[in-house]
Amino acid sequence: MSAEVGYGVTNGKSAWDDMIDCTIETKPMLFVIHALDRRDGINTRAKFYRAHRIHLDQAERYNVDVVTAGTLVADDGETPVGSIFVVDAKDRNAVDTFARSDPYHANSVWETVQIHAYNKKRGTPIQSRRS
C-alpha cells in the first residue's frame, strides 16, 4: 500500500511543501546613479575623494551593493566631470539615501544626480549579494 494521502502528497508532504522549503534567491534590483560635477568642482572633488571612496566601501550600511562605479571624464580621457554607479538595492529609497549621503553630494561636488532603475540585458551575470 502506498503512503499517498492525496493528489501530490506523499508521506504527508506535498510538492508545495518542497517549494516552500527551498531557498529563495534574491534577484538583483539594479539602479544607475548618474551624477554630474559642478563646473568648478574639481578641487572640491579632490578634497573629498578619500571620504567618497570610504562611503562606497561602506555601501552595505545602506543596504546597497555597488556593482560597478567610476568617474565620468571629459573627452580628453582624464578631466573628471561626474560619477556613475550601477548598484543593487532593495528599492529606490535605499539608493536615494545612499546617494544623498555620499560626501560628493553633501559637499556640492555634484551639481545634478539622477537615479534610474536599470534592466540589464547583456554582459556578465550579476548575482545579488543582498540577503
PLM features per residue range, with description:
Residues 2-131:
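Conserved, structured core segments of small domains
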